[in-house]
Amino acid sequence: MSFLKSFPPPGPAEGLLRQQPDTEAVLNGKGLGTGTLYIAESRLSWLDGSGLGFSLEYPTISLHALSRDRSDCLGEHLYVMVNAKFEEESKEPVADEEEEDSDDDVEPITEFRFVPSDKSALEAMFTAMCECQALHPDPEDEDSDDYDGEEYDVEAHEQGQGDIPTFYTYEEGLSHLTAEGQATLERLEGMLSQSVSSQYNMAGVRTEDSIRDYEDGMEVDTTPTVAGQFEDADVDH
């Protein structure tokens, strides 16, 4: 596979926590062979007997877990999901550019499974993975905790450099209006009153009951409808 490279295994300088020999690596269901798994603080690496292998950066690892499914042909193993693309180098050209573009919109996911010959080592492998992963938090998770809204600077206010937002009740707001503002408010209220009361002029008839209902809080007018006025209307039940 094209992504397999030759590199020195991580050592104590990289914070090596666990070295597990005789561990089979499986990529998306395809076996890569048996080698040694290195769980270090800097990266997760696997090398086969010939010195070829791969390394995974922790920020790209979205999930790691222990699989206890004994019905799986691999048996118990360490499962690792990576948000990156690892595959054999394809020799076939892409037939459709549109199909290639659609693949770019989907985040690539690769599944690795590490199967040690010594199943009792799985717990220690998982614990080491947890410790190393905690050293590399997801930057997106940190950004989501940031508040994008405008914040009130308490310290600046204590130093006399900030303003406290002012809130008024309805009555307090009226007292802060200028004479011109009060006149404008009265004019708007009058227009609103005329607009609402005009809704009670059915067929050109305005009754005292409709005015009283409006003044009492917009009650429903139960006055019988003039016979024949809406007989031709279609009603959906």
Curated annotation (Swiss-Prot):
UniProt-recorded Gene Ontology molecular function terms: RNA binding
Any one GO cellular component localisation term in the record: plasma membrane
Annotated InterPro entries: ICln, ICln/Lot5/Saf5, PH-like_dom_sf
Presence of the UniProt keyword NAD in the record: no
Bias-annotated ranges (Acidic residues): 139-153
Keyword tags: Acetylation, Cytoplasm, Cytoskeleton, mRNA processing, mRNA splicing, Nucleus, Phosphoprotein
Residues modified as Phosphoserine: 102, 144, 193, 195, 198, 210
Major localization class: cytoplasm
PTM annotation (N-acetylserine): residues: 2
Cell location: Cytoplasm, Cytosol; Nucleus; Cytoplasm, Cytoskeleton
Region (Disordered): 135-159
A single BP term in Gene Ontology: cell volume homeostasis
UniProt keyword Nucleus present: yes
Job of this protein: Involved in both the assembly of spliceosomal snRNPs and the methylation of Sm proteins. Chaperone that regulates the assembly of spliceosomal U1, U2, U4 and U5 small nuclear ribonucleoproteins (snRNPs), the building blocks of the spliceosome, and thereby plays an important role in the splicing of cellular pre-mRNAs. Most spliceosomal snRNPs contain a common set of Sm proteins SNRPB, SNRPD1, SNRPD2, SNRPD3, SNRPE, SNRPF and SNRPG that assemble in a heptameric protein ring on the Sm site of the small nuclear RNA to form the core snRNP (Sm core).
Family: Belongs to the pICln (TC 1.A.47) family.
Subunit organization: Component of the methylosome, a 20S complex containing at least PRMT5/SKB1, WDR77/MEP50 and CLNS1A/pICln. May mediate SNRPD1 and SNRPD3 methylation. Forms a 6S pICln-Sm complex composed of CLNS1A/pICln, SNRPD1, SNRPD2, SNRPE, SNRPF and SNRPG; ring-like structure where CLNS1A/pICln mimics additional Sm proteins and which is unable to assemble into the core snRNP. Interacts with LSM10 and LSM11.
Stated name of the protein: Methylosome subunit pICln
Gene this chain is encoded by: CLNS1A
